[in-house]
């Protein structure tokens, strides 16, 4: 009661914070955590001006008042404690509550469920989510000038577990913490198959790289799925515990079936004395079943035929449990193995210990870098032979360098695989590198050999090849190349000048995917030789940009013609029915795998049939593309930025003005009809949209500031290019 009576002084009068009594300090168990995080323990005994001196550095003091919600109908709040917390200036403003609670010593689960309310002086308090909509706003951007009059009220929920939290209260932070907990039990690919989030979104949320927070609808959907998942998991554990009782040593013949339970319920009401009379000897015979069965559920003496049936059923249950456990522990690698775009590399089987028993060295990352330098192999080759993954994943692992002792399950599996590979003799590793190089140079041979070695595989092997031509620059030492942050602007200017897509430029300039280039231009990290992966990739792009302009244009034209001729060849050879299926399969091209140019046959001479086939309409959106666009609306919203439109255009192989018109039409239906336009199992042609079905400029201004200007510029640019676009340029976009 004493603490509650003093709490209004702290909540309503920021000028009296320095005079808060010592009773307001945090619990003793949290003091060490506070000192470790730099919380000014003596700041309460000094005037506010003393705290302001710390703002010159990298931290900002934030006064936090933590309140515990008991969940009752009266919503009676109990203040736990009030304390200053030093928060880094570069922390995202949306993560302020979570960062402050972690600094105060609270758990990740409590921090994820908390809600923040900010109070500025004597103004009315405002929820933290109402302050700004910018996902990249930092604490310094919002509190740099007003930190001395700001009070951050943090309300803790009474739910001790995430599954007890209502689905309506799930947010981006709770989803991230739940994903981190689930990734300790399974890898990302397995989790993506079960939960309503894609694998790329899971990775982005966990690594805090998702450029926009997940929508509230998606968070609530994930919360409902998480509650069901935990409930099913608890029921599964209970069934396994109950199945342990079904062994012959515990006399399973006395377990009644459902019909007997129903009849016992009736007889228990009619003749309770007779039921008690029969239950006494049975209790003495099966003491192990006493905790889980009440006397009213125990059966009378069973017939010999029923006893034999229940013994046979117990045998069957025990066999099923034994087989399932044996399969779960026999081939753990085979269950989690993913071949990506490659067939597995045949290796000699050696009696080596399994990955689970291999201790990962703390300097595994330096060992990998030393091995790359010693063997003079690329990250792509090492990632392929060491743990059968892509170069992008290896680059991320080496860039983050997470501690193996606290790594997630999926990362630990990859680290153990790399450690296993590095434990091989040096001669053996060099032989594997050579085999991989030969396989990359001769993809057809490797595909035939892998298909013959694994005839049971129903998946068609696809070899990821890097095209070693004279046009593509080869990776060499970039010590004598001067690279600055201006290279990102040069890349964008080059794509705009040559009118090429990100996918085409990434392919010819660095032999990378469109997604990789999109992330590169989005983050624009400062080039430094210390970041070896980024530096080598930028050196490769710099060498390409240093080529004369006419040579670069020739490379663009050859790559575009090669891609176009390959697609047209397959379209001509197929009968009319599977043509639409082919277009759906190629709407998401394999960005990192394309056949070598020198093996591509020349396009066949035009025939009457091929000339009769018209190129597909550039205003039509297929069913598969509709699904991707609707998923984007569900996850991000109806207002994609320029980067998102460019990404969708390259991914769906559609012009930008087609995608822009689709979003304008959807916003029109949401504004005037209150819901999205439904497409009943048919493709959409945006050319059929009427002018009145698109939002006008004034309506755009009311809904989203500045959106119509960007859409207008993009639409005019695409319409100007559309009239003179060649078939090759159409396909490359």
UniProtKB/Swiss-Prot annotation:
Subunit annotation: Interacts with ATF4 and RUNX2; resulting in enhanced DNA binding and transactivation by these transcription factors. Interacts with PIAS1.
Basic and acidic residues bias (residue ranges): 709-733
SMART domains per the UniProt record, alphabetical: CUT, HOX
Disulfide bridge map: none
Region annotation (Disordered) ranges: 1-47, 435-473, 580-617, 694-733
Protein known as: DNA-binding protein SATB2
Protein's cellular compartments: Nucleus matrix
Known tissue expression: High expression in adult brain, moderate expression in fetal brain, and weak expression in adult liver, kidney, and spinal cord and in select brain regions, including amygdala, corpus callosum, caudate nucleus, and hippocampus.
All copies of domain CUTL, residue ranges: 161-234
Modified residues (Phosphothreonine): 467
Keywords, alphabetical: Chromatin regulator, Chromosomal rearrangement, Developmental protein, Disease variant, DNA-binding, Homeobox, Intellectual disability, Isopeptide bond, Nucleus, Phosphoprotein, Repeat, Repressor, Transcription, Transcription regulation, Ubl conjugation
Phosphoserine: residues carrying this PTM: 20, 39, 454, 594
Gene: SATB2
PANTHER family (UniProt xref): DNA-BINDING PROTEIN SATB FAMILY MEMBER, DNA-BINDING PROTEIN SATB2
GO cellular component: chromatin; histone deacetylase complex; nuclear matrix; nucleoplasm; transcription regulator complex
Amino acid composition bias (Low complexity), ranges on this chain: 441-458, 580-593
Pfam families the UniProt entry points to: CUT, CUTL, Homeodomain, ULD
Organism this protein belongs to: Homo sapiens (Human)
Cross-link type Glycyl lysine isopeptide (Lys-Gly) (interchain with G-Cter in SUMO2), residue numbers: 24, 30, 161, 350, 475, 724
